[in-house]
């Protein structure tokens, strides 16, 4: 499977996964008790919204929401979410969206901490605003009116509980590589473990293929 991502990246001359996106500034305010170690209080974050398959123009796609959460010092947690369903079954299914605030963004697979399985999602607070799924429309919209999300977590019972709010605003004008598998808080891992290893390999091959296409070096494990 990794060779597929590498070949696709070489063909596109960019990463195979989430090739088209926009890095923005944001604020994460974690104010509720949570199983996952979100830092309490308000923190500045970097956010990347992207198209998973890189469909042309404003065609629907599985959209991605990556958030770099500061953990203190030089440590951070790169949380990667994709548009998905909201119930106990569909929360594990990536689903395409016709606009940036059209669906919730979920972790799809759970995190494991102290034996607990925990899913994470970001729910748009304004679903009536239809921002076409292309980076240009997103840049204009975020510059004028910030995007607001409620961050929720859920255990095996399928009940969602609000743990934070996320506000996304104008462009950050930074080239950031998110590392959703390698940048995890202490004591937290992706479940199952084999899927985490597979994602590391997929991201590595995606970036290596793009690097071979343009003659640059790739860093393993980044998205």
Residue ranges of predicted features:
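Active-site-adjacent core segments of small-molecule enzymes
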Residues: 1-223
């Amino acid at each position: 499977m990794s060779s597929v991502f590498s070949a696709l990246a070489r063909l596109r001359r960019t990463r195979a996964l989430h090739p088209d996106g926009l890095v923005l500034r944001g604020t994460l305010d974690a104010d509720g008790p949570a199983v996952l170690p979100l830092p309490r209080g308000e923190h500045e974050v970097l956010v990347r919204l992207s198209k998973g398959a890189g469909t042309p123009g404003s065609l629907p796609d599985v959209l991605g929401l990556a958030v770099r959460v500061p953990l203190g010092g030089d440590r951070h947690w790169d949380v990667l979410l994709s548009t998905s369903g909201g119930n106990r079954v569909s929360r594990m299914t990536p689903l395409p969206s016709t606009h940036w605030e059209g669906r919730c963004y979920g972790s799809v697979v759970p995190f494991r901490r102290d034996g607990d399985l925990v899913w994470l999602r970001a729910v748009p607070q304004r679903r009536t605003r239809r921002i076409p799924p292309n980076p240009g429309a997103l840049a204009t919209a975020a510059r004028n009116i910030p995007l607001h999300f409620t961050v929720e977590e859920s255990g095996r019972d399928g009940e969602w509980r609000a743990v934070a709010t996320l506000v996304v605003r104008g462009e950050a004008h930074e080239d950031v590589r998110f590392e959703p598998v390698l940048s995890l808080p202490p004591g937290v891992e992706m479940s199952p473990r084999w899927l985490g290893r597979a994602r590391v390999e997929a991201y590595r091959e995606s970036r290596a293929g793009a690097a071979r296409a343009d003659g640059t070096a790739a860093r393993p494990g980044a998205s």
